[in-house]
């Protein structure tokens, strides 16, 4: 038995990136505890984060590259796997670079190098066909930001330390932590807002766990957020409460927005949303009276009907009320460098390519995951015939799994990189074993590092805590 040692690291399961103290013995992580001295995450961690090492030690963990032979998988060397995959890729690329596609899952986003090298690999192939899990839950935010601010990663976030009124719409941070903002210990942070006299009002079809903490809940019918926001804006304009000086020289289209909202007074939308007109007016009163207020949204809004329009209207409320880029309102973070300027200079995330199926415009360098099955199954020029799946399990997480399964079975090449032989990998021609987060050095992912989307600013880094248990490789090195 080797001597146990403790070391500091951080979790890479969700955006909170909680600080952890790991106990390591004989090249195994034997325990994970919250880092009570951590500047940013305040000694908090959820149960998933504290028990993740048990999953990485599972006997079902992939140890070597695997190749499908008939109806079973056989272990092969990395040299053989890369050689055979490379030969098939060259054959498909010779017909059309667009015959190759990639699905990038959420797990890729929590490794700083994984998505960079995965996208670089596809650029090297000359293929535009990248699909991601973001189109299922948060693409609306990127689309709204692209149209409103000119860059999809321009994502203002609530100033939790000073906000006096917070409308939480379509998100439940007590359970899901936060979204598009690095916040640990959500219950503690919400209670801090209340203890200093702030009000938190949850607008949701359900009396959520967050509503219980907030103490104030406003019922809304599902998929009617757009009408709620339109009436909210109409109230602001009808009271002549729009903060024009705050937006002077910074915004255009105010008159057009005023005209659109004029047709949706609270009395008209009350029956649609289920929110009485007087209740909505009271919400507007509270919001405008606060010295710092914010509408906060999440995946409930993004996965609902008209999610992009709803997100845009929510951003408009924050801007028109004078709370955009304001203490106590919504802030614009600063990362370690000017990511937006760098991206604009290099044309990142702003290409105007269109999909073969549906003619959808590219967003954040990718197309909607919902058209992936059709891109594979529909014959014609640039039909996808080879796929790489990395950091995700689309057969389990995407809608219409039966059609996705049919599509994957038709592929001439399916390569899956993961830590387990999951549902998607079970259909693959090759499965490549990846390292776990505890087996790689890392920095925080793009939101806190490049965009400064943190409620408490700090910079973290971690070394690999243990060596891989088998022949696993970090995804970035694979691509």
Predicted regions and their residues:
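N-terminal export/assembly segments and adjacent metallocofactor-ligating motifs
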Residues: 1-239, 276, 390
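Active-site-adjacent alpha/beta core region of enzyme catalytic domains
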Residues: 331
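Non-catalytic alpha/beta scaffold blocks inside enzyme catalytic domains
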Residues: 37, 139-313, 320-326, 334, ...
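Generic structural signal for short, solvent-exposed loop/turn connectors between secondary structure elements
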Residues: 25-30, 57, 65-74, 94-96, ...
């Amino acid at each position: 038995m080797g001597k146990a040692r403790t070391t500091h690291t951080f979790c890479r399961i969700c955006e909170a990136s909680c600080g952890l103290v790991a106990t390591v013995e004989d090249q195994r992580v034997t325990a994970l505890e919250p880092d009570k001295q951590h500047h940013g995450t305040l000694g908090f961690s959820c149960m998933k984060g504290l028990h993740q090492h048990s999953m990485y030690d599972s006997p079902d963990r992939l140890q070597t590259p695997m190749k499908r032979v008939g109806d079973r998988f056989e272990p092969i060397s990395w040299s053989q796997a890369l050689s055979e995959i490379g030969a098939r890729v060259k054959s498909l690329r010779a017909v059309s670079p667009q015959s190759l596609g990639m699905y990038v899952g959420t797990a890729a986003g929590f490794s700083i190098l994984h998505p960079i090298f995965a996208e670089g690999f596809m650029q090297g192939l000359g293929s535009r066909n990248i699909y991601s899990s973001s189109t299922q839950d948060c693409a609306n935010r990127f689309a709204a930001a692209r149209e409103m601010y000119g860059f999809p990663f321009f994502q203002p976030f609530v100033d939790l330390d000073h906000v006096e009124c917070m409308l939480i719409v379509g998100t439940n941070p007590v359970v899901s932590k936060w979204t598009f903002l690095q916040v640990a210990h959500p219950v503690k942070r919400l209670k801090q807002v209340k203890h200093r006299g702030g009000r938190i009002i949850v607008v949701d079809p359900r009396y959520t766990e967050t509503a219980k903490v907030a103490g104030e809940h406003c019922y809304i019918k599902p998929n009617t957020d757009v009408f709620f926001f339109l009436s909210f804006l109409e109230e602001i304009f009808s009271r002549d409460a729009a903060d024009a000086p705050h937006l002077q020289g910074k915004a255009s289209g105010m008159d057009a927005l005023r005209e659109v909202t004029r047709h949706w007074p609270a009395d008209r939308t009350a029956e649609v949303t289920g929110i009485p007109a007087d209740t909505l007016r009271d919400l507007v009163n509270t919001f405008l009276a606060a010295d710092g207020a914010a509408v906060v949204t999440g995946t409930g809004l993004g996965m609902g009907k008209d999610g992009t329009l709803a997100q845009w209207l929510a951003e408009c409320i924050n801007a028109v009320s004078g709370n955009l880029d304001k203490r106590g309102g919504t802030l614009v973070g600063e990362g370690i460098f000017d990511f937006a300027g760098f991206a604009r200079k290099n044309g990142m995330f702003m290409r105007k390519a269109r999909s073969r199926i549906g003619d959808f415009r590219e967003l954040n360098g990718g197309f909607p995951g919902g058209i992936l099955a059709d891109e594979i199954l529909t014959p014609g020029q640039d039909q996808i015939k080879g796929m790489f799946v990395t950091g995700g399990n689309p057969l389990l997480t995407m809608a219409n799994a039966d059609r996705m399964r049919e599509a994957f079975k038709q592929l001439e090449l399916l390569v899956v990189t993961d830590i387990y032989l999951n549902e998607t990998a079970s259909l693959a021609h090759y499965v490549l074993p990846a390292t776990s987060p505890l087996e790689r050095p890392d920095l925080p992912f793009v939101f806190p590092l490049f965009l400064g989307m943190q409620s408490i600013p700090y910079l973290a880094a971690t070394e690999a805590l243990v060596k891989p248990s088998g022949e696993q490789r970090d995804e970035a090195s694979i691509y």
